[in-house]
């Protein structure tokens, strides 16, 4: 629509007669529009009224169309805004072009086109193409009019003829006819301007030969734009001034910092020079000191080498003298030591292992006795009605039983560890001494047990024999038998109705006193039937007392003596006991009759203890008034490994075996004893040193 209106405005351009009035202002055509009020007034005078009115109508139509379009499409606000901007810009450019049509030149048209190009709107540029061409046609007409004016021709009426009606419409210049009418040819694009030419084609006709000047304000917003421009100019000046002030401040600060940095640089350079000077001084001193030290080092090294050579000579001389003396002495001792070393080492090793095993058995025996006692009390406590006292006593005995078991396990582990170390070559003296475990006191007595377990003939235990004071024979020597002795049986067992009667007399010289072993019997049962076999001898039935035959050989004599000493046992039981003793000792050689009787008594006491484990002990001994004497079993162990420098000689046929090492004892190596026991001097050496009474380790008899 804007293109058609512009085409209409171009068609209504001033005629040649009107353009004749522009000849006077031909010099002003090259000036830009809006530079001065005089030029604008001259242009306003030269502008035809018809062009101004057409321009105003075109602007109003464009604005109305834009408003109607925005009202019809409210959804496309963003796109319409840009479109409206383009339309307004196009209106301004068209108005400028129309203003330039009267007095502008082709340079002005180029400025308008460049303005549209700067806006970057291709559609607006396309819409300005026909306007530009129309303005070019107007300029061409104005030139023709100026020619006519110069030639002082009479104004003629120019008639624009209508071109062809086909799709490619062109304005061709009309040859001036005889009446003086000239045609104006306007070159336009066939494709872009065909539609606008079809819509409106006007013919300009000069009807009046007079011209009148009129003033029309073609730019009504110039004052507003000037005010706005001045305001923007003021703001820009203020901003420029602020930026300039800030720049000056920054420059001042940078100058101050630069001065400080320069001053600091000078100081650092000065310090650097001083440090370099100090480094040079130190380097010189270091070089001097280094040279001095190297010189002294060379001197000291030379002296050291001389001294070492002298010392080496003296040492070599002394070593040779000592070696010669030692070599003579060692040659004399080497043969003797080599002969004795293996023999004595093996004997000491076996003696240490045997001593450790003996002590372990004795300690475990004591702990097993306490364990059986606790188990018996727990058995009776479990059979009683549960009360507060029984529960408390049960807990105490359970605690005691657990402690005893732990102690027994620890004792076994410690002795086994020591035995293994000795077998691996460790010295017994270097191993720590295994302390004797101390049992805590038993729990306190309660009265309810006496009330519950009353003596009755049906519950009375049957003891095969009663044991008096029996001393356990010793197996191995010990450091201090007094501190290691302990009773095997703490509680005492007896029959409530029939006390035992001891048998007087004991056999053997220097043998400990043995209590008579008498079998209990009642009026209602025969003596033979009331003697059960000792515990641990299962499968061997006690036979009735029968007359024994006379001993035939040495074994029969030994059995006869043992059966006389222990009449409660028969021959089969005694043979079994002797077999157990032989198995435990691996041999019975070297034992005297007194020692054999002691071992048999210990075995019988052990069997009796096992049998007594089925009866109440300790806390319920009031139910069994007949006491069972304790068996005192002191333990003996060597305190250190023994080195034996001596060498055994050839033993005669009358020599006996040592009770410790089980080897023949020469008369010169026999340790004098008050008893008949045979021991090496070296085997009993540490026992004699640690025992103040100098007693035999196998019997408590003094020397």
Curated annotation (Swiss-Prot):
Pfam families assigned to the protein according to its UniProt record, in alphabetical order: TTC3, TTC3_9th
Alphabetized InterPro entries for the sequence: TTC3/DZIP3-like_helical, TTC3/DZIP3/RBM44-like_helical, Znf_RING, Znf_RING/FYVE/PHD
Domain of life: Eukaryota
Coiled-coil annotated residue ranges, if any: 220-379
Annotated positions of the N-acetylalanine modification: 2
Biased amino acid composition, Low complexity: 493-504
Spans annotated as Disordered: 1-59, 104-134, 146-197, 486-552
Statement: the UniProt record of this protein carries the keyword tRNA processing: no
Stated name of the protein: RING finger protein 214
Organism (species): Homo sapiens (Human)
Taxonomic classification: Eukaryota, Metazoa, Chordata, Craniata, Vertebrata
Name of the encoding gene: RNF214
């Amino acid at each position: 629509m804007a293109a058609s209106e512009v085409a209409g405005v171009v068609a209504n351009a001033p005629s040649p007669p009107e353009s004749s009035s522009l000849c006077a202002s031909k010099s002003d055509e090259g000036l830009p529009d809006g530079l001065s009020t005089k030029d604008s007034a001259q242009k306003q005078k030269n502008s035809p009224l018809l062009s101004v009115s057409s321009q105003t109508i075109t602007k109003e139509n464009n604005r109305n169309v834009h408003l109607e379009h925005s009202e019809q499409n409210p959804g496309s606000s963003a796109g319409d805004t840009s479109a409206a901007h383009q339309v307004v810009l196009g209106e301004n450019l068209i108005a400028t072009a129309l203003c330039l049509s009267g007095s502008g030149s082709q340079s002005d048209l180029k400025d308008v086109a460049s303005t549209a190009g700067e806006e970057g709107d291709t559609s607006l540029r396309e819409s300005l193409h026909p306007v530009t061409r129309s303005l070019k046609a107007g300029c061409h007409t104005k030139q023709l009019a100026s020619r006519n004016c110069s030639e002082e021709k009479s104004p003629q009426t120019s008639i624009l003829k209508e071109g062809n009606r086909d799709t490619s419409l062109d304005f061709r210049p009309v040859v001036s006819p005889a009446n003086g009418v000239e045609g104006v040819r306007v070159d336009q694009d066939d494709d872009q301007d065909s539609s606008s030419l079809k819509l409106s084609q006007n013919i300009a006709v000069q009807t009046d030969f007079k011209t009148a000047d009129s003033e029309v304000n073609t730019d009504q917003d110039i004052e507003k734009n000037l005010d706005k421009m001045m305001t923007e100019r003021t703001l820009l000046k203020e901003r420029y001034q602020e930026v300039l002030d800030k720049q000056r401040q920054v420059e001042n600060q940078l100058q101050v910092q630069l001065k400080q940095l320069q001053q600091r640089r000078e100081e650092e350079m000065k310090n650097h020079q001083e440090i370099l000077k100090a480094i040079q001084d130190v380097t010189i001193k270091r070089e001097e000191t280094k040279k001095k030290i190297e010189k002294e080092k060379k001197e000291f090294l030379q002296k050291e080498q001389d001294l070492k050579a002298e010392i080496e000579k003296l040492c070599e001389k002394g070593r040779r003298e000592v070696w010669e003396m030692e070599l003579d002495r060692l040659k004399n001792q080497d043969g003797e030591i080599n002969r004795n070393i293996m023999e004595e080492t093996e004997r000491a090793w076996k003696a240490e292992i045997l001593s450790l095993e003996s002590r372990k058995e004795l300690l475990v025996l004591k702990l097993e006795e306490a364990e059986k006692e606790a188990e018996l009390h727990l058995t009776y406590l479990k059979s009683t009605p549960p009360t507060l006292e029984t529960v408390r006593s049960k807990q105490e005995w359970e605690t005691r039983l657990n402690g005893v078991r732990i102690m027994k396990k620890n004792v076994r582990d410690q002795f086994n560890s020591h035995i293994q170390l000795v077998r691996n070559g460790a010295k017994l003296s270097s191993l720590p001494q295994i302390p004797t475990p101390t049992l805590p006191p038993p729990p306190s007595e309660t009265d309810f047990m006496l009330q519950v377990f009353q003596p009755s003939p049906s519950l009375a235990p049957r003891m095969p024999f009663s044991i008096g004071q029996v001393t356990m024979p010793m197996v191995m020597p010990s450091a201090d038998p007094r501190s290691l002795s302990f009773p095997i049986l703490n509680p005492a067992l007896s029959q409530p109705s029939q006390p035992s009667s001891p048998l007087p007399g004991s056999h053997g010289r220097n043998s400990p006193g043995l209590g008579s072993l008498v079998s209990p019997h009642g009026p209602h049962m025969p003596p033979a039937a009331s003697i059960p076999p000792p515990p641990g001898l299962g499968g061997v039935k006690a036979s009735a007392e029968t007359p024994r035959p006379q001993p035939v050989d040495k074994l029969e004599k030994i059995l006869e003596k043992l059966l006389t000493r222990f009449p409660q046992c028969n021959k089969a039981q005694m043979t079994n006991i002797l077999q157990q003793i032989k198995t435990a000792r691996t041999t019975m050689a070297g034992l005297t009759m007194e020692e054999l009787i002691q071992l048999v008594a210990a075995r019988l006491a052990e069997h009796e203890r096992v049998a007594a484990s089925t009866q109440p002990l300790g806390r319920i001994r009031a139910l069994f008034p007949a006491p069972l004497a304790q068996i005192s079993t002191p333990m003996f162990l060597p305190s250190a490994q023994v080195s034996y420098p001596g060498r055994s000689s050839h033993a005669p046929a009358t020599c006996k075996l040592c009770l410790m090492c089980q080897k023949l004892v020469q008369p010169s190596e026999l340790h004098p004893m008050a008893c008949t026991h045979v021991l090496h001097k070296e085997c009993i050496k540490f026992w004699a040193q640690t025992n103040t009474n100098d007693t035999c380790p196998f019997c408590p008899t003094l020397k």
